Amino acid sequence: MFIDKAKIHLKSGKGGDGAVAFRKEKYVPAGGPAGGDGGKGGNIIFVVDEGMRTLMDFRYKMHYSAENGENGKGRMQYGKDGEDLILRVPPGTIIREEKTGHLVADLTQPKERRIIAKGGKGGKGNVHFKSATRQAPQFAIAGVKGEELTVTLELKLIADVGLVGFPNVGKSTLLSVVTSAKPKIADYHFTTLTPNLGVVRTKRGDSFVLADIPGLIEGAHEGTGLGHEFLRHVERTKLLIHVLDVAGIEGRDPLEDFEKINEELKLYNEKLSTRPQVVAANKTDVMGENENLKKLTEALAEKGIEVFPVSAATKQGLDELLDYVSIKLKELEDTEVELEEVEEEKLYELKEKDTNQFTVKKEDDTYIVEGDFLERLIMSTNFEDMDSLTYFQKVLRRKGIIDELKKLGIEDGEFVKIYDVEFEYFH
């Protein structure tokens, strides 16, 4: 099972409701308004953690909620803001909105932070609604709902060098002897199901991150086997070490394998076909008398690709291979791996829709009006209080709802329904 993709549900905190409260003072109607504002809802923030290597944590928990803001209080006391929820992810994590597929964030830098779900604003207390004609407002405004969305997390492995090749050619063994990584090693296809990372330190004193990319098979670019998941990890490496079995233990032709794997890389992503490569001709310790190595070296020399005879089992030839890779990486230092462009405008779509958007439709003899801000307004209105009712009507006019009802031909005596509240319309 791959641990490089996960789907999770996010819900940021709701803003706290404004309070209806009054002071106790002489000669002030009803004591004067003193309801404080609600606190802001908590954000959900993703932070890059260099110590993480997988999305394993998100396999065991799928729902994440930030804290709601506290409601306002009397004596003009504001509610406390909800605490932000911090979710830590490995470097290289891509976040997409599951519903639309839009790219929300591409997190690569250490300690990089990104707000993915923004907390709702706190509501206004009744202290804000006092006027010359409204001395003791009996209403306040509810807090705004937090954003709620499902996202897909995708980990694109960040490594300097990737080991590619068919299953069972010795990639995991190679990684284990040149780094401190301890991948599972066995003689069967698809041995490596998740990428393994290790840090190589050469005798020259250089170091780089090496990734054992899970094995490929023909048809991988179409998703055959575990193809798409495997190929996804190759995209951000600067250089590839193509591991081939020159001993031909399973009857394979190393040159044919080289061509097949490169064709899969090209079909998956055209840019991968131009990624610098070096070949590790592995299992020379059990090669015996065959022409595979000579044939391979001559054919790849025409393509300008270096071939290093090695044995991961005996460590023969590995120092020369790693020194070459280290030098090559220095030549590629200025090469930047292309990242997908982050669509910044997609970050707070849900928040933007809360402000003024509404819909009006007629069903039978009733006009149905809906909108996020209207749900808030209904929750905030005291329909037994004339001041509150007057404010409610004022908002309907200011937001253009009355004009829209008129365009649809509403007449006096017809019914309007806004969520759970239904009333007769009179001009």
Curated annotation (Swiss-Prot):
Task: State the compartments where it is located.
Answer: Cytoplasm
Q: What is the required cofactor set for this protein?
A: Mg(2+)
Stretches assigned to the OCT domain: 347-427
User: Do the record's keywords include Lyase?
Assistant: no
In this protein, which residues make up the domain named OBG-type G? 159-330
What positions does the domain Obg occupy? 1-158
Residue numbers binding GTP: 165-172, 190-194, 212-215, 282-285, 311-313
Q: Which UniProt keywords apply?
A: Cytoplasm, GTP-binding, Hydrolase, Magnesium, Metal-binding, Nucleotide-binding
Q: What InterPro entries does the entry give?
A: G_OBG (IPR031167), GTP-bd (IPR006073), GTP-bd_Obg/CgtA (IPR014100), GTP-bd_prot_GTP1/OBG_C_sf (IPR036346), GTP1-OBG_CS (IPR006074), GTP1_OBG_dom (IPR006169), GTP1_OBG_dom_sf (IPR036726), OBG_GTPase (IPR045086)
Q: Which GO terms describe its molecular function?
A: GTP binding; GTPase activity; magnesium ion binding
Cite the binding residues for Mg(2+).
Answer: 172, 192
* Cytoplasm found in the keyword field: yes
What EC designation does it have? 3.6.5.-
Which GO cellular component terms, listed alphabetically, does the Swiss-Prot or TrEMBL entry include?
cytoplasm
| GO annotation, biological process | ribosome biogenesis
The main place the protein resides is cytoplasm
EC class (word): hydrolase
| HAMAP family (UniProt xref) | GTPase_Obg
Q: What family is this?
A: Belongs to the TRAFAC class OBG-HflX-like GTPase superfamily. OBG GTPase family.
**Task performed by this protein:** An essential GTPase which binds GTP, GDP and possibly (p)ppGpp with moderate affinity, with high nucleotide exchange rates and a fairly low GTP hydrolysis rate. Plays a role in control of the cell cycle, stress response, ribosome biogenesis and in those bacteria that undergo differentiation, in morphogenesis control.
Can you state the subunit structure given in the record?
Monomer.
According to UniProt, the name of this protein is: GTPase Obg
Tell me what organism the protein belongs to.
Answer: Alkaliphilus metalliredigens (strain QYMF)
The upper taxonomy is:
Bacteria, Bacillati, Bacillota, Clostridia, Peptostreptococcales
Gene of this entry: obg
